[in-house]
Amino acid sequence: MREVQDEASPGGDATRDGHADEGTSAENAAAEGAARTDAAGTTGLIVGADGRTRPLWAASDPLLREYYDTEWGMPVRDEQGLFERLSLEAFQSGLSWVTVLRKRPAFRVAFAGFDPEVVAAFGAADVERLLADASIIRNRMKIEATLQNAKATLALRDEGGLASLIWSFQPAQTPRPEHARDVPSSSPESIALAKTLRSKGFRFVGPVTAFALMEAVGVVDTHLLGSHRRGSSGVWS
């Protein structure tokens, strides 16, 4: 998932950067050129045409830019929202995050809006249906893990719920990275979270995936200090 840290991108895999849609506009091409120029700089940040400062990965594709500006790092505290993000982080493993974002609408249809009660009731026929659905990422292990994770999510309700568990691993302090290379790919808290999730029956979640989840839902803030989104979650000052 984040085995190779790439410009502090969500999930951080090496394929995340440089996968723009076909027909990239002149504006995006210019932004990418600026990104390449800035790559030798000291921050790993670029200033977009709108005057806002972002990390390189968030400037490489319009969909990533929108995701960065509106979603990534904002607090998610509801069960369904967290189950969706945990599921998508697992599906992203080995792939680029922009691929997941492009397929997210189809994922939501295929997995009933990531309602854990519905997904937990999926059976063998549903697995075959999902494997035949070209609009999503067709990987049997990831699909079966998602079904198991839905069941584990329901079981957690007797212990306070998925949101309570994930947010209980919020650290006392969040990273304050000045450059993309300063962003960690895991932490003591993500190691502990992954271990706890696995003990509760969750699959396809390790320390790196757990940290990417924590970043995505605001448990930690790894926005670079010079980014226009730093501190936007309201969780960290």
Regions found by a protein language model. Name each.
Residues M1-N28, E32-S237:
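HhH-family (HhH-GPD) DNA N-glycosylase catalytic core used in base-excision repair
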